[in-house]
């Protein structure tokens, strides 16, 4: 009895920055970094991010993804990688990989791993940074995601909800620019 897992590297399979799966597809507006194409000159004849948003709105992204990886096997791991993002365009001290993993029961977790020796120190400090930020912002109404350190990784709880970016995008799309501006400045004032 074979089982299959589908993965979708983005922007392509040669230089993926992010890898999605059927268990974690991109959100609308997330596929906006399409300038990475190192193997040949490329003309951009249309706004690709708008096309991706249309595909996502119609649940068609897997059928039109630029590339895919299909893993087939008899056994599936207990903890399955649903999403991976590589932050290798940063300074080597912050060159990390973020993974979202899930279990059969639907539980999800977020882990950050160092991709370089220099980034290990950054990962080891994330738990303390999380605690310090929680203390700093506790009176502001901002909750900081809980972090616990592991052996060469930092784990965060997976949170469901609407991001500030998604809320701002919705307000702008609805033409509510005054509300979007007010919301943005409310948050910038909170984190000053």
Regions found by a protein language model. Name each.
Residues 82-132, 167-168:
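ATP-binding glycine-rich loop module of kinase domains
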Residues 12-14, 117, 162-163:
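Feature marks short, surface-exposed loop/turn motifs that line or immediately flank catalytic pockets
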């Amino acid at each position: 009895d074979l089982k299959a897992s589908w993965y979708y590297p983005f922007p392509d399979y040669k230089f993926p920055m992010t890898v999605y799966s059927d268990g974690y597809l991109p959100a609308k507006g997330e596929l906006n970094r399409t300038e990475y194409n190192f193997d040949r000159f490329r003309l951009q004849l249309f706004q690709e991010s708008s096309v991706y948003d249309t595909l996502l709105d119609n649940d068609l992204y897997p059928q039109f993804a630029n590339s895919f990886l299909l893993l087939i096997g008899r056994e599936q791991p207990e903890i399955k990688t649903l999403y991976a993002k590589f932050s290798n365009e940063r300074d080597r001290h912050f060159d990390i990989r973020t993974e979202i993993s899930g279990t059969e029961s639907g539980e999800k977790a977020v882990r950050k791993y160092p991709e370089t020796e220099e980034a290990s120190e950054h990962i080891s400090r994330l738990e303390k940074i999380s605690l310090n930020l929680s203390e700093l912002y506790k009176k502001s109404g901002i909750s900081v995601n809980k972090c616990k350190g592991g052996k060469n990784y930092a784990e965060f709880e997976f949170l469901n909800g609407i991001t500030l970016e998604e809320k701002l995008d919705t307000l702008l799309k609805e033409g509510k620019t005054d509300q979007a501006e007010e919301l943005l400045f409310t948050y910038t004032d909170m984190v000053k």
